[in-house]
């Protein structure tokens, strides 16, 4: 079974981009970006380093101060969910109110 971790970045005020880091059953990893691009890596650590280098932060590692710095309340946001890939990608770019 695959394991998903969600990451986000704020490229400009009022906008969030999500990325999904998935650990595959074969111990490889893949990142699904908000553009719909999927990038495969040999392992989870390489995928994490890729996201960190692109200024993403792990959603499960955010605290209220981190969230405020990105422009949202931690309790008001959850990773995107959708029944299929194209619908998920459409939800991976969010405008904040």
Model-identified regions with their sequence ranges:
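Intrinsic-disorder/low-complexity coil detector
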Residues: 10-12, 78-79
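Residue-level signature for short turns and capping positions that connect secondary-structure elements
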Residues: 36-37, 46
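Mixed-charge, Lys/Arg-enriched low-complexity segments
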Residues: 44-97
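N-terminal functional modules and adjacent low-complexity/disordered segments of proteins
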Residues: 3, 11-12, 16, 67, ...
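Short aromatic-glycine-(Arg/Gly/Cys) micro-motifs in beta-strand/loop hairpins
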Residues: 11-36, 54-59, 64
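Negatively charged, low-complexity tracts enriched in Asp/Glu with abundant Ser/Thr
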Residues: 1-10, 97
